[in-house]
Structures are given as C-alpha cells and as structure tokens.
Amino acid sequence: MPLTMTITNSLMYIIPILIAVAFLTLMERKMLGYMQLRKGPNITGPYGLLQPIADGLKLFTKEPIRPLNTSPILLILSPMLALTTALLIWTPIPMPHALTNLNLGLLSTLAISSMAVNSTLWAGWAPNSKYALIGSLRAVAQTISYEVTLGIILLSTLMLTGGFTMQLLTTTQKHTWLLTTSWPLAMMWFISTLAETNRAPFDLTEGESELVSGFNVEYAGGPFALFFLAEYTNIISMNLLTCILFINPGPTQHPELFLTNLIIKTMILSMSFLWIRASYPRFRYDQLMHLLWKQFLPLTMALCLLHTSLSISISGIPPLS
C-alpha cells in the first residue's frame, strides 16, 4: 500500500507538469504568431487547442532513426536522463506542500539542475557527429558558467532568510517580497535563468547557420520529443523557483490560493521568456561569456559579501528598548 501511494503521488505530480509543458509550447507559438501579425496554430481543434496533442502523437509514432557508428546506450539514455533530471527538480518545490520536504531543498535543486549537463554532453558525443559535439560543448560551457552566478545568488538569498528550506522563504516573504530589497539579485537571477535554459537571446546552441540544430541534431521522433519536454520543463521550473525566491505568495490560510497565486506568477514569467524571444536578437558567444565573467560574477560576489556582513553587523547592534 505505501508503494502504491508513492507511485500515485509521483504520477499526480508529474502528469500536470507534462500537460503544462505541452500547452506552454502552444502558448509560445500563439504569442510568436501574434507578435509577427499572424494567427499561429488554429486548425487542429477549436482555436488550435489540440495542436500539442497532435504534435506529441506525431513525434512518438515516428521511427527513431539511429545513425551508424553511434553509441546506442548513450543515445537512448541521454534524452531519458534529461527529462528525469528536469522532473526531479520539482520534488522539493512547495505547492504549498512539497513531494519531499528536504532540509537542504535549495541546494538539492541546484545539484539536480547541474546533473542535466551530463545528458547534454552525452547527447552531443553519442551520435558521433561533429556538429552535435560542438553544439553540446557550447551548451555545457554556457550552463556550467551561469550555474556559478545562480549558486552565488542562491547563497545571498539564504543569508537573508537564514535557512535552506523553501518553506522558510515563504515565511520570510510574509510582509514584503525579496524582490523589493534585493532587486539587483533578482534581475541577474532572471537573466541567468534565461542562459541556463538555453533560451533566446542566449540560444547559441541552436545557431542554425552554424550548427544546424545544436546537440540534438541527430535525434528524431521520441528521443527528440523527450529533449523538447525537458527544455520546457526546465523553463517552468526555473520560473517557479524565481517566484519562490523573490515574489513568494506568502503563508496564506487557504492552500488553494497559494497555488493559484504561484501558477499565475509563473505564467507571467514564462510569457516574459517568450516575449524576450520575440524581441531580442541572439548574443555573440564572446558577449555571453563577457556578461557573466566580467559583469555578473563580480557583482554577485560583492552582493553576497554585503548580505553576509549586513546580517552579522545588524545582529551585533544592541536592542533599542
């Protein structure tokens, strides 16, 4: 019985995420369409609402083509690992109750997201294609680089909250959002999440003129769909993490209001991701690295030191009464 309940809970957690990912792709195509003065998908079902289901059926019923001289085990494992790590990130996130309430929830989220680098590297190396390998090396360098700033920003917010659990972040933001007190961190966090999820204007892994389609160029059908699902799952989870860190709804009496509030804010942030894609051109690779190592990293380290010293100095001030 406990095993059945565990499996049921996990499925009840995973299935809504995958449905949300499917309709995020539809929202992206609709938004890009309207921003380019066209309709977007409007044939399959009423207003094109069945388009994600049709796309999924088409991809999973196609024959997965395996080129010669490939590493078959890694070719199959890498898309599976990508989606697994993307879904594992959700386990410590409170909505309002987490699937597993971890003491080091934020650190575990960062550790799981850094594991996704392995799937990207395997996906580029397994097909034995130079274009896929160059694309994966770019993606790995970009992901590892921006994880540094994400880690330091997380450390800075932990200095303000005083703990590693996500429930503590909710309690801290009962009266005011952390966005109001640490908006430079929030700004750098948002830009770093764009780079971490390989979204425009940092989608250098998909420079069509250079690398055809990046590290997943040799994938088709089901394995490609798994990579696609993993990418959009990461987008939603990163935006959800942004909400919890900086614009948390706070502990309310009604859990359903907490979840509704969180979903609305996550949707707004996801729409801003799509808006940025429609508005800005792609960065050059040197500009991408310059932004991180020369601008974001010194700033985040300085703010981390400030937050650490501020909390220590304030705790040393004697009470007024």
Curated annotation (Swiss-Prot):
One of its GO terms (molecular function) is NADH dehydrogenase (ubiquinone) activity. It is found in: Mitochondrion inner membrane. Its EC number is 7.1.1.2. It is an enzyme of class 7 (translocase). Pfam families: NADHdh. The chain crosses the membrane at residues 7-27, 73-93, 104-124, 148-168, 175-195, 227-247, 256-276, 297-317. Keywords: Electron transport, Membrane, Mitochondrion, Mitochondrion inner membrane, NAD, Respiratory chain, Translocase, Transmembrane, Transmembrane helix, Transport, Ubiquinone. Core subunit of the mitochondrial membrane respiratory chain NADH dehydrogenase (Complex I) that is believed to belong to the minimal assembly required for catalysis. Complex I functions in the transfer of electrons from NADH to the respiratory chain. The immediate electron acceptor for the enzyme is believed to be ubiquinone. It comes from Varanus dumerilii (Dumeril's monitor). It is a multi-pass membrane protein. GO terms for cellular component: mitochondrial inner membrane. This is NADH-ubiquinone oxidoreductase chain 1. Signal peptide: none annotated. HAMAP family: NDH1_NuoH (MF_01350). It catalyses: a ubiquinone + NADH + 5 H(+)(in) = a ubiquinol + NAD(+) + 4 H(+)(out).
